[in-house]
């Protein structure tokens, strides 16, 4: 059974990201890689991975560059210290990459980013900074990054497992500008 992009009347539990009743305490988000049906196959995207993030999804890039379509972050006025929660993870039976199934095994990821939401050119002009789904492929390196909370040992588990990840500010060596922070000039995103 797969998720069909063309089936807008499909039940929500058939989507890659859905609400699920069997959380650690009540409901939870269920993220699952699904087949996309004939429309997805036609555009060379036969699967859709369940994901959840704070930010925006840019539909204009969804088919041509899906990682660029995920715009991470929302303005944030506080210095985050930890990312805490619970997860349960089971890797899929097959791993799809570059147009075919491979022998690789899927690995999940949980992380949060805190970054400068504006940059300035030599003329002093302000440009909004938007980090996207390419960040993990760049080893979480970007000139605007301030801190990262990254799960250190992602693994399969049959039972709910707690995570408590401190934000690493030393990695990027930047000081927080309290005035910019108070004005919401930093952005935060949590990505599953």
Q: Residue spans of the language-model regions?
A:
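A short beta-strand element within beta-rich, extracytoplasmic domains
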Residues: 79-91
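Aromatic (Trp/Tyr/Phe) and Gly/Pro-enriched flexible surface segments
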Residues: 1-82, 105-115, 121-164, 168-192
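Extended, low-complexity, turn-rich repeat/linker tracts enriched in Gly/Pro/Ser/Thr and Asp/Glu
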Residues: 89-97, 101-105, 118-121
